[in-house]
Amino acid sequence: MIPTGAAFVAGVTGDPIAHSLSPVVMRHWIDAAGIDALYAPFPISAGNFDRVVRGLAGAGCRGLNVTLPHKEAALELARTASGPARAVGAANLLTFTPAGIHADNTDIAGFLYALAPANVEFRKARALIFGAGGAARAMLYALLTVGVTDVAICNRNITRAQGLSRDIAPDAGIIPWEARDDALQGRDLIINATSLGLAGRDELALDWQRVRPGSVAFDGIYIPVNTRFIVESRARGVTAIDGLDMLIGQARPSFEAFFGRPAPDLPDMRSRLLEHLGAR
């Protein structure tokens, strides 16, 4: 239905945000639910984040999903926060209530939702995470909750990697960026939580010959779906998972938080997104 002047309004913010498929996901669910609602992208720069978010809250917006580079700032802005958001130190969901702004992190559930079909033996896994920002924080926390004990962090800024380890996983290994290929040896769960590979940016180049076929590789990027990380890991015989399913998985609880009802069951959502991207 076409939104009216009484529509519930929510959205997504980041910088950049034009690439986001969150409005597409939400539009499909809004239409399937038949509710009067609008979900829009809001490009907000870091310097304007607090002011604009507070303005949207004051204008009656129901809330925002939050992506790079604002996830840590979102948590700091909120008056209250869920336990997982506090533990991770980052939020990808802000809801605006009469009591104030509330922060949550649905990336944790979204990440595990995406990994589920791969049947990873988490307690035996040797994981390697590239990145140390808000997404990496959520993914590292998620791995710990399902029993992963052997994990290493590799980031271009080693100080941020050390901070991530200190905050969430003190026993995690810290790998200098220049040693990233050596770090692949013996790892069977490799995760790209950086922005490398996002359309218009540099790719994450790795020596996949060092990875055992049958391992699992996850890329949080979904535009493009077939990043260099995905294409080259798949060519090695690795189970490669792109970011689309994490997008869908993290969006479900967001929809309910914004609009007060569960997201409709659309088993073909991934196919709809691929069709939208022209990636079939």
From Swiss-Prot:
Residues making up the signal peptide according to the UniProt record: none
One GO biological process from the UniProt record? aromatic amino acid family biosynthetic process
Q: Name one GO molecular function term.
A: NADP binding
Q: Which residues bind NADP(+)?
A: 131-135, 220, 243
In this chain, shikimate is annotated as bound at: 20-22, 67, 92, 107, 222
GO CC field? cytosol
InterPro entries named among the record's database cross-references = Aminoacid_DH-like_N_sf, NAD(P)-bd_dom_sf, SDH_C, Shikimate_DH-bd_N, Shikimate_DH_fam, Shikm_DH/Glu-tRNA_Rdtase
Any idea of its EC number?
A: 1.1.1.25
Which domain of life does the protein's organism represent? Bacteria
Q: Reaction catalysed?
A: shikimate + NADP(+) = 3-dehydroshikimate + NADPH + H(+)
> Could you tell me the keywords of this UniProt record?
Amino-acid biosynthesis, Aromatic amino acid biosynthesis, NADP, Oxidoreductase
Q: Give the record's pathway.
A: Metabolic intermediate biosynthesis; chorismate biosynthesis; chorismate from D-erythrose 4-phosphate and phosphoenolpyruvate: step 4/7
Q: Which residue positions are annotated as catalytic? A: 71
Q: Its function?
A: Involved in the biosynthesis of the chorismate, which leads to the biosynthesis of aromatic amino acids. Catalyzes the reversible NADPH linked reduction of 3-dehydroshikimate (DHSA) to yield shikimate (SA).
Q: Which family does it belong to?
A: Belongs to the shikimate dehydrogenase family.
HAMAP family per the UniProt record, alphabetical? Shikimate_DH_AroE
Q: How does it assemble?
A: Homodimer.
Q: What is this protein called?
A: Shikimate dehydrogenase (NADP(+))
Gene source species = Maricaulis maris (strain MCS10) (Caulobacter maris)
